[in-house]
Amino acid sequence: MCLLLVSFGVYGQVSEADTVGQSAYPFISYEADTLINPAQLQPFFDKLLKLENGDSSQLSILHIGDSHMQADFLSRQVRTRFQQRFGNAGRGLVFPLRVAGTNEPTDYRSASNVNWTTGKIVGQNRDPEPGISGISVRTSQSGGYIDITTLNHDDLDYAFDQVTLIHAKDSLQFDCRITDSELKFGYLMSAADTENGTYQTWVPFTKPTNFVRIQAEQTSESQNAATFSG
């Protein structure tokens, strides 16, 4: 589930502390360590400078990688330092990895009351089709839910006031109820006014929260599953 899509900034300056002598790592070819067409990065750094000067806009950064990204090792350090310096726009893209039976970062938790079928971009099982996180989950049990709880850390508050759910949407998909521990925030009708495919549904909340529950709900005999990608 997308919990307030992450936005953060960084602005770097070269100093003596950033420089490592070539003698320390003689096997590195520093001449080959060159950015091609660095001028294309200037708009990016201009936005970072605006954030540093107090601008309230958001800058989204997509960090692509392998299982080390999934476990949030490097990406957590980068995200934390960016947000501590330039402002915290939220935890960003999360997926219920624990529910899917794999490793999960330590700054949020996922749980469910049912078992989910998992489709991963690695391996031979790609049913359901993997989504933006490289993985998707599906349940055929009405009433099955996924809980997401964000955890504050390093003086960063990861409460959120909106959710963007990436999901399959057609006449065969369950409807979904989106709630916190007390309030009903939204209701997703999977077959309403849409062609078949993958969709993003945005749900605003009435107040910040660290918890959301997405619950599948069968409302017609034709519905047989719920499929989530992010």
Feature map (PLM): residue ranges:
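N-terminal secretory targeting modules
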Residues: 1, 9-64, 68-230
